[in-house]
Amino acid sequence: MEIARETLITIGLTILVVLLIITGFSLVLRLIPGVYSSVSRSSFTAGRILRFMEIFSTIMFIPGIIILYAAYIRKIKMKNN
């Protein structure tokens, strides 16, 4: 049972890392002048996706980093015991 729990935690953290990488890229893309506006002008769907990713990344980035840091501290604590 413990192995299944650890596996699910690892899978969840991996998904969270991938989401944080995507949201971080979305935030960086917003900072590059011209790219965001040209993509949103060229395709309505791409503009909506970028807008959603911008909102999602703003909401998700800080809590995601805190969750990853807490998992890292927990892992270090378990190794020391």
UniProtKB/Swiss-Prot annotation:
Keywords: Late protein, Membrane, Transmembrane, Transmembrane helix, Virion. Induction: Expressed late in the viral replicative cycle. GO terms for cellular component: membrane; virion membrane. The chain crosses the membrane at residues 8-28, 53-73. Its main location: virion. InterPro entries: Poxvirus_I5. It is a multi-pass membrane protein. It is found in: Virion membrane. Belongs to the Chordopoxvirinae I5 family. This is Protein I5 homolog. It comes from Fowlpox virus (strain NVSL).
